[in-house]
């Protein structure tokens, strides 16, 4: 019998109809007719937040397996959360590859140990790791602990072991890290902010009062002008950049870009102007001069809301590149003259007519008068007509009904003048009246997903949570310390909110030391380590080089790739007695002792460092909160267990710390009280829950808290606090981080809220997550209205006065002072004003000044040849000698990110490694033609510190600029390669970069240095 294929299936189906096979769905006709099931139907959905950049995109993670025995959950799909106000379901190429990151073959599963001189890892147990690390730390602490300094002052510090803290770990991990390190007396505590956005805090806080992004991602849509300078938002923050495009498409906004390269952001801009790397201050000072000369500023705003009218001391001055008070030997200023003339009551003298020759307004005019369009062109290489066109665009937003939003990132921060780059733009925004406005602001686009939060929590050498300062050895007792850090108003009647410093500090000490902190022992003041100088990462690696450091803990950080002068970093790590890495991934730092040929040429047998490689969980494997660039604290949930026996950072820190406590309790040693009195009273001490830690960070009442005016109880004993306004300085409140007060209230976890309603249409989704401070979305929003309370632009009205209080579409960033009261909108400042003149808050001057990069292609400073580079920037002797000169290294090198990669992480993720598999550098067409370099050639890029090899991408995107009579060519160097990961092996870009940083924060000068390039 002959049958067709179709007939055959019919016969088979009929014969199977009553069989078990048919019951299981194997009958072809049944299978063919069945509707295909939705592949996510049987999965578990978990909400999380992207671990990469600071946009803070919402995620939906899907896993199979219900967590029962033999059914371990495994995440197999991740997509954007469509309900999230910022990303609305979208993800960038990095976020699209998150599953490959979670399941990377580079994920660590077991603790491992590398013995001194060994060339291999050996697997050990957690008990062995914790016991050995605790033993090494205690031995080092007991041998090198400094209880008193040479003057006999109690300092209780430990300098010979340090800790490098993470950039993407949760706030709860960060808070535990702060307690862990300070309980041991550590001062060498630093995080990713030191090498990225440290200058943001150092510039925005002196200018406005707080060192954070002033607005938020969605608010960018309200701008009439978006200026991207010192960053490449389309590449580095693509989903956040959609809001700039939203402004263009739906608000008619113009987008302008000023950058050494024609970037992906420039590709969609309305106008692009080139600039020589490292000359932003000259360019922006020229903009200031243009605004002043053409009266393109908001006069009423400037007079009422800035310190333009305040009178500066007669002995302040500036001449030939230096402000008054400079000490060339110390490379520091005596800043005593950088302040106001005071009246008999201690308030600043003022001339509201702006006629006094010593008022800030006239000193500013005098200072920027040198930055004419011709001077800008000569220094920056920007054609004069292009510069003036940018000025015109910016000047238009001085109108009351227009705003400009300025977006910047590491292109501004990673210079030896990084903080002053940002301050110059902040001054422009004050003149334009764009601060506090919807669609305005100075918007720092943070690089890492929680670098904002970890900075908020004070994981820096001289910091404490909430931007408080760790005591110095000059502050010998609590009262001296509080007096030094509690400012007095400089104008009558101002809020001066830092005047509440004692409440913030005492409440933090109660969170740290609990019942052990009492008024009698000054709330445990002497248990905090006291610093003599900053122990930032550049300082600390210099100490390593000198043999003064024995131990180092790297938590979620890869300094071999991330720090300047890779060869110096390798040499420093080789001098340690022990190194502990805590990371989900295998990193170059954990393997610094391995020989990888010219990528890392070392002799393992000569490196005597004991190395511990401890596997930690990643973002998808723990609960917790992180803070995006817009200050939103967003809670995320665990979607799966970590591979192998990896632990959370909190469990790892607890494992080490609890062993140290046990040893100090049983054996004694150097200042056991400092270690034993730190609270660690979690329900499961070796496994603190994120929820417990978040509640501790928020704070609670330790006794009934009463209203000072009425005596009524406003918070009952044991209850969570709802606001930092409830904090007290008498020990009756506990709060680990005062700016996070309100994040976990009696009503529950505010960070987990998911109401994305936006009734104003301005993007202020007050019911989504929680923003510090007190859920305010736009900082300084009282400045959105004039002194009488009328909005500058009714379409952007944020606040209104209802007769008794301020209300509106945002939480008022202000007191209850009524319109016309004269209380300024910058409530953290002593004057209540934004500062055009920064007083003594900046290292190199109260006004910004153009200084050349330490490796300048010009060899001089056209403004003042005797003061070429930042005179207040610190540089060590050997690093100064390692600086290159333009005769041997004639081109400007600058490093940057690609949209397909995230720093040194995504080379471990297969999808991203496929998208950008091979290391390359960008060379302008004219230079390539001159050097005989063609597309795809292998080239060697060298500085005075080392070299890398990469493929050449010859491009029109980088042009030759003319500055001070010289042709200036730039070499673009993406940073993402190394000798670990699934991507093709490559050189570490920071082999090339100089070991010098911003004068205020020591953030390295990655964006402008000298190189040579040659065809291999």
From Swiss-Prot:
Reaction equation(s) it catalyzes: formate + NAD(+) = CO2 + NADH
Entry PTM: Exported by the Tat system. The position of the signal peptide cleavage has not been experimentally proven.
Cellular component, GO annotation: cytosol; formate dehydrogenase complex; membrane; periplasmic space; plasma membrane
Cofactor needs: Mo-bis(molybdopterin guanine dinucleotide); [4Fe-4S] cluster
4Fe-4S Mo/W bis-MGD-type domain segment(s): 43-106
Top-level EC class as recorded in UniProt: oxidoreductase
GO molecular function, a single term: electron transfer activity
SMART domains: Molybdop_Fe4S4
Key words of the record: 4Fe-4S, Iron, Iron-sulfur, Metal-binding, Molybdenum, NAD, Oxidoreductase, Periplasm, Selenocysteine, Signal
Signal peptide (residue range): 1-33
Cofactor: record remark: Binds 1 molybdenum-bis(molybdopterin guanine dinucleotide) (Mo-bis-MGD) cofactor per subunit. Binds 1 [4Fe-4S] cluster.
Pfam families associated with the record: Molybdop_Fe4S4 (PF04879), Molybdopterin (PF00384), Molydop_binding (PF01568)
EC number: 1.17.1.9
Protein residues bound to [4Fe-4S] cluster: 50, 53, 57, 92
Localization of this protein: Periplasm
GO annotation terms (biological process): anaerobic electron transport chain; anaerobic respiration; cellular respiration; DNA damage response; formate oxidation; heme oxidation
PANTHER family associated with the record: FORMATE DEHYDROGENASE-O MAJOR SUBUNIT (PTHR43598:SF1), TUNGSTEN-CONTAINING FORMYLMETHANOFURAN DEHYDROGENASE 2 SUBUNIT B (PTHR43598)
Function according to Swiss-Prot or TrEMBL: Allows to use formate as major electron donor during aerobic respiration. Subunit alpha possibly forms the active site.
UniProt record similarity statement: Belongs to the prokaryotic molybdopterin-containing oxidoreductase family.
Subunit comment: Formate dehydrogenase is a membrane-bound complex, formed by subunits alpha, beta and gamma.
UniProt name for this protein: Formate dehydrogenase-O major subunit
Taxon lineage: Bacteria, Pseudomonadati, Pseudomonadota, Gammaproteobacteria, Enterobacterales
Gene name in the database record: fdoG
